[in-house]
């Protein structure tokens, strides 16, 4: 999911830089653990509450960070590779990998197709806007990146019910690891009906 390395910053959109390339772990002092809540809800199928844990350890020179992740639990747990030299927060890639596998499960469409749609939209169709969030009782400044990767997909007829899916990334340097949360939402066919599907990951805090 991460754009290819070796390109200058100007080759990437503002959304790509905010989501994939920013040094989101700059405010983290390893060893540290980031804790996130995860909630799935909606009328499409049963929901659940779970958690996500990311553990960070210092590199040999003391800098940040090598990381290990636990994304959800039990039969929902996502097998994740360790990351040897993380700069951006791995929780973003983990969430997107979970999301892509869910899109495949719900539609039987190829995972690589959904990856490509997300990459293309973050590059050329995402919105980045200033935002403020609440974190541990305080208001913090940040940015919200939002996009709908399937809205103008010529193949959307194959999964029309899910084609309006919206992604929102809540980013703030005032939050450990730089990512306050990620939300996805698929609205129902009528405005007065509850959403078809929502998923929300929110940071709970950091511990040494």
Which ranges hold each PLM region?
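Surface-exposed, glycine/proline- and aromatic-rich loop segments on solvent-exposed faces
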Residues: 77-102
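Acidic, serine/threonine-rich low-complexity disordered tracts
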Residues: 2-83, 107-208
């Amino acid at each position: 999911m991460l754009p290819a390395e070796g390109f200058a910053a100007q080759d990437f959109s503002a959304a790509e830089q905010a989501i994939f390339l920013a040094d989101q772990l700059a405010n983290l002092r390893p060893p540290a653990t980031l804790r996130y809540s995860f909630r799935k809800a909606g009328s499409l199928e049963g929901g659940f509450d779970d958690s996500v844990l990311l553990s960070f350890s210092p590199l040999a020179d003391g800098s940040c960070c090598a990381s290990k992740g636990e994304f959800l639990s039990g039969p929902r747990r996502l097998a994740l590779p360790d990351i040897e030299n993380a700069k951006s927060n791995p929780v973003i890639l983990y969430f997107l990998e979970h999301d892509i596998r869910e899109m495949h499960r719900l539609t039987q469409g190829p995972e690589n197709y959904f990856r490509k749609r997300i990459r293309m939209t973050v590059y050329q169709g995402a919105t980045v806007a200033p935002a403020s969030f609440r974190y541990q009782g305080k208001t913090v400044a940040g940015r919200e990146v939002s996009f709908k990767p399937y809205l103008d997909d010529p193949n959307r007829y194959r999964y029309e019910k899910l084609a309006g899916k919206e992604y929102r990334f809540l980013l703030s340097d005032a939050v450990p690891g730089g990512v306050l949360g990620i939300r996805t939402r698929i609205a129902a066919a009528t405005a007065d009906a509850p959403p078809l599907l929502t998923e929300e990951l929110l940071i709970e805090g950091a511990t040494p």
